[in-house]
């Protein structure tokens, strides 16, 4: 034991440390273990590389998506901006044929047109105007490109002896369809018309309006547009009776594309409802009014400085900048300083439903206001016929009553009774003719005129589709003034033996009627003859 200790102690220090180092050194790994570690390391490196590639791709994808979102948002903003820009300007549709307020014609000719039934006689000096049939045929003969017609009636091809003018008009329309002239027609859906079917087969475009689906009304509009230049508007529809037995009145504008620019939009509005069961919540800007009571069309009519605009009914059919018929009538009455003359078939300020009838004060109240508050003289010429509502006389009595105790309140009412003329006809004449009726629907004042499609009945304005025309003129003394001509027509009818101040009698004086002259013996157009103004 001592010897071994001595031997250990006698060994060199270097030798001892070398042995300790050898004993503490780990064993060398085996080759297989080395390969496993290398493979594991390589796998980790590959996964790390794949993860970095995926992260880079993800970043690129997110960046690309963000760019797409930004681009999409910019495109949407640009589209909205373009829409706003175009909504701020007047877009001219194809139907307007490139017309604008800058290039349209506002120096126009205008003519009153009337249909005076055969056997209706006036005094020698009574004014007469262009016959309605001749005026309509003139328009169709002038047509070169297009004829657009809105009418409440389509009954031209009748077998009655008095329907010959209606048949000629129908034949002319058929002829136009074969001459490469575009014919567009608008009618109420309830019209069961062989005339429309025949014209449709020949190529005419027919639009049926289902007013019942909108507000339980019907179409009563009556106007024409020819070649985007000429216009007719008035009381007459395309009915043979309007060219024979009915007393009708309207106006024709020649070379007046500025008025067409506005009226065409009402025609387009009707056409836009062709396949719709309800009115859109927002109208297209193409249907907005061009002129209204606030912005009237400035034009020359027969070289007379004038203003004009068209109105529409019901309120449901009045897009932005389109005057409602009631508002148009209000503007005419409010501007009157001396007198208001009104000629209508029916005057009945009542709104009726299936269950009740209520007072409708819109026009009746405006008349009372003019009488009482502004001392404007009012004359009402109302047709008397078998459909006259007995309540009409009650409302007339009520109107008259307000003037009994008020100074400077002047109201006179007459009933235009063609039943008297019918009663004086011979048996042979009665067999050949239908009852005659005055269907005029207009108002004239000392500075303006309104010509429309409605009687002054509540339901007409609130439910039915109709169009009105307002004309303002400062100088109404010139015989070329359409307002003076219309005033002369009113006075002619007012002073005729057919107008009575009280409820008409059923026993007419036939001998007095035989002494008067028929308008058929008068020239087609004549100026007013200078009759003294209507006494008030």
UniProtKB/Swiss-Prot annotation:
A Gene Ontology term for the protein's cellular component: endoplasmic reticulum membrane
GO molecular function term, any single one: hydrolase activity, acting on ester bonds
Cellular localisation: Membrane
CDD domains listed in its UniProt record: PLDc_vPLD5_1, PLDc_vPLD5_2
Taxonomic superkingdom: Eukaryota
Region (Disordered): 503-536
SUPFAM superfamilies to which the protein is assigned, alphabetical: Phospholipase D/nuclease
InterPro entries registered for this protein in UniProt: Diverse_PLD-related, PLDc_3, PLipase_D/transphosphatidylase
Pfam families linked: PLDc_3 (PF13918)
Family to which this protein belongs: Belongs to the phospholipase D family.
Record's protein name: Inactive phospholipase D5
Species classification: Eukaryota, Metazoa, Chordata, Craniata, Vertebrata
